[in-house]
Amino acid sequence: MAQYIVLTILVASTLMMPAITTAGDKPSKKGATIKEVKAMSEKDQTALALSAAPLHIAKEAGIMIYGADGKLTETKKSANGFTCIPTVMNLPYPDPMCMDAAVQQWKTDLMNNAPKPTNTVPGIAYMARGGSHFEKDGKVVMSGDGAKIVKEPPHWMVMWPFDAAATKLPTAPNPSGVYIMFEGSPYAHLMVYQDPRKMK
């Protein structure tokens, strides 16, 4: 199940707004496969990774790109607690993400099929190029089996187990732009459809 949503998640980049310049913005190929993303030069992967976050965060963020072995490798240490990667789910567009340490822990737990995330504080992650999620029978689901891929606009996330009953927040995408994804599961988190590139 985790292999379908890594970090949320969330999501293959729609690259819906390629004309808007972001930190390190250098448009990648639309529809690039994960294999093609991993084959990109260090410069191009870095530009793609940094395009996930607002400029003031991206300029001091750490960077991890795919090496020759296909694994993420750190090429720049973070000076502000955030780390950016060039793609997450890639269905089929690159969906770069910039995340803090709490989200990195959340991601690790998800990948390791942990029963619940172990981050002790809410985590913040940015996806300024947007992403996607799986929907089945009108609901956002974690598994891609039998589900359709739905594109998402630029957004940011708060990785914390928000409870819909307690917060009264929606549990599906809606005009307000805010909802709890995976509500009812330990990996529930808040989605905010707001372009991180416009945040200062």
Cite the ranges covered by each PLM segment:
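Bacterial N-terminal signal peptides that target proteins for export
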Residues: 1-8
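Boundary at the C-terminal end of the N-terminal hydrophobic targeting segment
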Residues: 19-25
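Position-driven detector of the extreme protein N-terminus
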Residues: 2, 17-18
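Bacterial N-terminal signal peptides
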Residues: 8-17
